[in-house]
Regions:
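A conserved structural/catalytic subdomain of Rossmann-like adenosyl-cofactor enzymes
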Residues: 2-161
Length: 161
């Protein structure tokens, strides 16, 4: 995880060249600026890399890279987590014992739960933070993680064979 400037600044060209020389860049995922709030509001990116290796990852010059940007902010501007509410799933009948009936969520959320009865809980009874990084227990939409897994399979990356 690096501040986004490290990937863009001309003064950091040496870092980019070092990474490209020693690793295959698998993915670059831009995180929302609120992810690390309240500690910092600097926009960051996650760089997924695989060290060049003759057997597992032979060096090649031209290859595709997965790019994605987090759209759901997961925290408000003060750094408070935003949780998924039951009423955001209008098209489904949410039953306490069967959370698998949840349909596609609507993208309207509020932070700081008032009553736990209003919020969607995962299979462990925990609140679900709104984000688009991965599908949470099958209760939320597929996210960046699932898209990367499909990319990795399509590209026949060694860790998905």
């Amino acid at each position: 995880v690096l501040p986004q400037g490290r990937f863009n600044n001309t003064s950091d060209k040496q870092i980019r060249e070092f990474i490209a020389e020693h690793c295959r860049i698998l993915a670059v995922v831009g995180l929302h600026g609120n992810v690390f709030k309240p500690h910092t509001g600097i926009k960051t990116s996650v760089l997924l890399i695989q060290k060049w290796d003759e057997k597992l990852c032979p060096k090649i010059d031209d290859y595709p890279i997965f790019f994605a940007t987090m759209q759901e902010k997961s925290k408000d501007n003060s750094g408070e987590k935003i949780f998924v509410r039951k009423k955001d799933f209008i098209n489904s009948a949410i039953i306490e014992s069967d959370v698998n009936l949840v349909a596609e969520p609507i993208d309207h959320y509020e932070a700081n739960p008032i009553s736990l009865d209003e919020y969607l809980l995962d299979s462990h009874g925990h609140l679900i933070v709104k984000h688009d990084l991965f599908n949470h227990d099958g209760l939320t939409k597929d996210g960046i993680s699932e898209a990367f897994a499909e990319f990795a399979k399509k590209e026949k990356l060694s860790f998905f064979l």
